[in-house]
């Protein structure tokens, strides 16, 4: 049996469950927070950035190493790292002439881990 992903089940009635609507409305985050959350998830919408995050999930790495790992130019990697840094997902530190990147904190690792768990569910 295959699921039809293009059809949505709908109610056959027009009953409003006001108690549930009000309960959810009271807990709903502010519009600005939801907008910021949507912007965060947009950053995860690029496979190159996901590959970079995966690499940094495993180890702190410099731009040169990430470029070799992903078979991309340093310029392309730097561009994506800039986007990730603006989204506060990665941080960097400079050691002499080498700039190392890593995930900002465990929250980023958890988002990544939860995403992988979700897509691997059967």
Q: Where are the predicted features?
A:
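Beta-hairpin "wing" of winged helix-turn-helix
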Residues: 85-95
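N-terminal leader segment of winged-helix/HTH proteins
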Residues: 1-44
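N-terminal helix-turn-helix DNA-binding core of bacterial DNA-binding proteins
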Residues: 29-75, 99-106
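Alpha-helical residues within the helix-turn-helix
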Residues: 68, 79, 85-86
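Conserved segment of winged-helix/HTH DNA-binding domains
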Residues: 102-122
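Generic structural signal for conserved hydrophobic packing positions in ordered secondary structure
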Residues: 45, 77-80, 115
